[in-house]
Amino acid sequence: MVNMANTVKVAAVQMAMHCNVEDNIFTAENFVRQAAAKGAKVILLPELFETKYFCQERNYGYYKIASTAEENKAVRRFSQVAKSLGVVIPVSFFEREKNNTYNSVAMIDADGSILGVYRKTHIPDDQFYQEKFYFTPGNTGFKVWKTAYGNIGVGICWDQWFPETARCMALMGADMLLYPTAIGSEPILDVDSMPHWRRCMQGHAACNIIPVIAANRVGTEDVIPCEENANQRSSLTFYGSSFITDACGELIAEADRSSEGVITAELDLSAAYDLRMSWGLFRDRRPEQYAMLTK
């Protein structure tokens, strides 16, 4: 079912992260309040915004910051903020459950309740994004939550590169697809991946006729060699460029590569639903022909 309010204003927060968790939560809250003041009802924060992107290095000390959703400082704070402002806030956090840790999102509804947790399905692993060292591949399956402002699906960063993520959430009835992100320049490659990154998600919007919201961080984050990280050195410049598309994949709001701030856009969910139905993309699917996708 679509949101019977027909239209909803959404926002993406773009921010730089620092060493202190409380400072990052404070900054994120200020941006959330700015977005709400502009009328936004669904507000997306970047991936793992409580900390710098620690996955640039392998350091066992970072396991200490993992927590359950109930214990997590950001989840607890934004549950209060969401209730106070009457907004929906997906919160990305480093989750601990028993002997496993996950890269997760807690979906907080406009009444402050936690509707559930999604755990990142696709976990990258290379010199600059060493996430397999920290995160177990998610076991929740893809999630779409019925919120006060529509049915919302969330994929986390690397999930956004896989069309299966978007299509599964579309089949589950998502009105919008949200992607909290931490991505930047790759020093070992003489390329700029930002346009490719954007086009990938614009394609998901167009192929499913569902709006997409992506929130990225900005700033350069350096890893200093030390005994705890086995003398690893790394540096990433996160290229921001957060954006919002309409249901056909057109950019309707975008941030630059380096500035902190909030972008907003009005989404007509009812019109998107009507357009989605008129195209027949889901009517004409042939799942019995897609067995290769499971191999």
Q: Where are these predicted regions, by residue range?
A:
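Active-site catalytic loop in hydrolytic enzyme cores
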Residues: 67-70, 80, 96-203, 278-279
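Active-site beta-strand/loop signature of hydrolases that rely on acidic residues for catalysis
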Residues: 10, 24, 32-61, 82, ...
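A charged helix-plus-loop insertion that forms the helical arch/lid used to bind
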Residues: 58-71
